Amino acid sequence: MEGDELTQNIEQWKIKRLIDNLDKARGNGTSLISLIIPPREQLPIINKMITEEYGKSSNIKSRIVRQAVQSALTSTKERLKLYNNRLPANGLILYCGEVINEEGVCEKKYTIDFQPYRAINTTLYICDNKFHTQPLKDLLVMDDKFGFIIIDGNGALFGTLQGNTREVLHKFSVDLPKKHRRGGQSALRFSRLRMESRNNYLRKVAEQSVVQFISNDKVNVAGLIIAGSAEFKNVLVQSDLFDQRLAAKVLKIVDVAYGGENGFTQAIELSADTLSNIKFIREKKVMSKFFEEVAQDTKKYCYGVEDTMRSLIMGAIEVILLFENLNFTRYVLKNPTTGAEKTLYLTPEQEENHDNFMENGEELEALEKGPLPEWIVDNYMKFGAGLEFITDRSQEGAQFVRGFGGLGAFLRYQVDMAHLNAGEEELDEEWDDDFM
């Protein structure tokens, strides 16, 4: 993956995680501030607005809510001062306020400000009991969207592929008359009826294409793939019935062995060369390569949190495969008596088990604690590794998450994981003996 693309993928991943956290947050009254400023705005005007809002907040009757709102407005104004009245090139996103728990007690104070990885066109200022994240979500769906029309003698399907997400928009079946074997006038009449049915079918497909892929008189996809198992796909594209605005967007016509959703899947795969930058295709290719390494037992792969992190730290990893929603926490723990440190990677269930934080009857001190995926994203380059994000929205990605734990890697050289693990167990036993 090229540097710019990987940087954008990392920024998108960070925004997804931020959205998850912000959507869960709740504040007291209208104490949570969502402020989004596009690059065309003037920062002094925004500062003046915040000052005026502070003055108005003195009218809030509830003392607790008033203090929370004023605290958030003060923090917002202080943060804006850091930009010296000059907005970043892509605009500014800011969230600020005190988040409360179910008992109404302040749990955490958010002050988050950053420049989005691409220019944002939305202007937003809202004080509410929740953060408003829709503009962030809109940033994530700005990948090119491609349309698919799957057409054969049994029916048609209309779908889209955007990033990792494919969607069936509409589908319908058709019962076309077969060729008539009799001769004479009967054959001519049936032939005429058959051609009329085919033309009506093509007209319906052409009309539905406009419904699905044209909005406000503009084509709403970056390109079209037409697929099918018979001549219908070629006839459709060449037909005067097919809207010329859509015809101009046809990127490729592909032969598929199936109709319907199976044909949709095959069409995505067969148009891979045309849609090479679509993440869905990339994910399938990366995962297919990984599964091939596993099947051939090349020993140039690893999977699972423990083996992958061990391989990363020893510098053996070429590319890390990271499930975007991997739910592990990284701990660095210290034995207060011996001073020995160790690193653990725990699931939420394992974090509930207090035994994981005990050693020889002593409670271990937590030196570091944080989400494992964030640590990987912040540190993978220090070990000379690359990074690929994996979703569970493709069949291969879902298999990787279910069967391989959502974390794996391609290795630079062969590593015998079984031998490596056995060696570490022997070292652990020797370490234990030293302190028995």
From Swiss-Prot:
Which Gene3D superfamilies is this protein grouped with?
3.30.1330.30, eRF1 domain 1 (3.30.960.10), eRF1 domain 2 (3.30.420.60)
Question: Which InterPro entries is this protein grouped with?
Answer: eFR1_2_sf, eRF1_1_Pelota, eRF1_1_sf, eRF1_2, eRF1_3, Peptide_chain-rel_eRF1/aRF1, Ribosomal_eL30-like_sf
User: Which top-rank group of organisms is this from?
Assistant: Eukaryota
Q: Recorded GO terms, molecular function?
A: translation release factor activity
Q: Where in the cell is it found?
A: Cytoplasm
* Keyword annotations from UniProtKB, A to Z: Cytoplasm, Protein biosynthesis
Q: Does the keyword Repeat apply?
A: no
Q: Name a GO CC annotation attached to this entry.
A: cytoplasm
Q: What is its main location?
A: cytoplasm
Similarity comment text for this entry: Belongs to the eukaryotic release factor 1 family.
Q: What does the protein in this record do? A: Directs the termination of nascent peptide synthesis (translation) in response to the termination codons UAA and UAG. In B.musculus UGA codes for tryptophan.
Listed under subunit, the entry gives:
Heterodimer of two subunits, one of which binds GTP.
Q: What is the protein name given in its UniProt record?
A: Eukaryotic peptide chain release factor subunit 1
Q: Which gene encodes it?
A: eRF1
